[in-house]
């Protein structure tokens, strides 16, 4: 089970939003590269970056901070990034800079042809971010709810060749209410590619619950507010996940 610390970037700083609201941002660090180093030193095996300004602007807006993070830890672990990725040129720029994966969200839903082209051009590097509320997909920084069912879109995108899916339950994100395990497992069982859970992770119990369903295709979980607020000790959580995985592997 991959525990993936999130570094959300707004105006070059590391912040956390409450339910995607740019006006409800808490600044946790003015040095995102140092934050990345901290998580890697604590045992992170992948990092999840979000260009929040980019998500709303539709183009890269935190390039300097992203490059600083990649310079700091990019040679050590894979780094993935979402937010504002709307063109093949942007993807190419990011992958050339050292990102391992880019996450396409809104653009995948609104312009499936773009996603298809991206999967063809950058095979193995494209992750789809599906944000949903009550099983329906949301777009545009969660501000618009579509009529699309998550599972239907996930199956379609799997056919295009996406590497994995980051699934966010937006009713729970930043609220420390616990991961929506049932919805995550349902999605993972419906597709043959890995699913990464996101939104609502609050404590060690969530990690233990996710480890129990890893065999269904839940590859990891994005750790956001809980590791910044102190509700979850990241190093202890990764250690516990590794212990559980060892127990499950030996069972």
From Swiss-Prot:
- Please name the catalytic residues of this protein: 8 (proton acceptor), 131 (proton donor)
Q: What is this protein called?
A: 1-(5-phosphoribosyl)-5-[(5-phosphoribosylamino)methylideneamino] imidazole-4-carboxamide isomerase
Alphabetical list of NCBIfam families matching this protein: 1-(5-phosphoribosyl)-5-[(5-phosphoribosylamino)methylideneamino]imidazole-4-carboxamide isomerase, PRK13585.1
Record has Amino-acid biosynthesis as a keyword: yes
Cited SUPFAM superfamilies = Ribulose-phoshate binding barrel
Q: Which GO terms describe its molecular function?
A: 1-(5-phosphoribosyl)-5-[(5-phosphoribosylamino)methylideneamino]imidazole-4-carboxamide isomerase activity
Please state where this protein is localized: Cytoplasm
InterPro entries linked: Aldolase_TIM (IPR013785), His_biosynth (IPR006062), HisA_bact_arch (IPR006063), Isoase_HisA-like (IPR044524), Isoase_HisA-like_bact (IPR023016), RibuloseP-bd_barrel (IPR011060)
Instruction: Give EC number(s), comma-separated.
Output: 5.3.1.16
Q: In which pathway does it act?
A: Amino-acid biosynthesis; L-histidine biosynthesis; L-histidine from 5-phospho-alpha-D-ribose 1-diphosphate: step 4/9
Instruction: Output one GO BP term.
Output: L-tryptophan biosynthetic process
Pfam families on file: His_biosynth
Q: What family does the database annotate?
A: Belongs to the HisA/HisF family.
GO cellular component terms, semicolon-separated: cytoplasm
* Catalytic activity, reaction form: 1-(5-phospho-beta-D-ribosyl)-5-[(5-phospho-beta-D-ribosylamino)methylideneamino]imidazole-4-carboxamide = 5-[(5-phospho-1-deoxy-D-ribulos-1-ylimino)methylamino]-1-(5-phospho-beta-D-ribosyl)imidazole-4-carboxamide
Major place of residence: cytoplasm
């Amino acid at each position: 089970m991959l525990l993936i610390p999130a570094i959300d970037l707004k105006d070059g700083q590391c912040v956390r939003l409450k339910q995607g609201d740019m006006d409800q941002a808490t600044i946790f660090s003015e040095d995102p590269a140092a934050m990345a180093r901290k998580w890697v030193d604590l045992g992170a095996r992948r990092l999840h970056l979000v260009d929040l300004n980019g998500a709303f602007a539709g183009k890269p807006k935190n390039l300097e901070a992203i490059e600083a993070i990649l310079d700091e830890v990019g040679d050590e672990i894979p780094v993935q990034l979402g937010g504002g990725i709307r063109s093949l040129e942007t993807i190419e720029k990011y992958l050339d800079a050292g990102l391992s994966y880019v996450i396409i969200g809104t653009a995948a839903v609104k312009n499936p042809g773009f996603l298809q082209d991206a999967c063809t051009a950058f095979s193995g590097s494209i992750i789809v971010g599906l944000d949903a509320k009550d099983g329906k997909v949301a777009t545009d920084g969660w501000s618009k709810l579509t009529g699309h069912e998550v599972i239907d879109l996930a199956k379609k995108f799997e056919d295009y060749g996406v590497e994995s899916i980051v699934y966010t339950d937006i009713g729970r994100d930043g609220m420390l209410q616990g991961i929506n395990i049932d919805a995550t497992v349902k999605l993972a069982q419906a597709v043959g590619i890995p699913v990464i859970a996101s939104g609502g992770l609050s404590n060690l119990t969530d990690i233990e619950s996710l480890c129990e369903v890893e065999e269904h295709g839940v590859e990891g979980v994005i750790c956001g507010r809980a590791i910044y607020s102190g509700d979850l000790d990241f190093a202890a959580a990764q250690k516990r996940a590794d212990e559980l995985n060892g127990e499950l592997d030996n069972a």
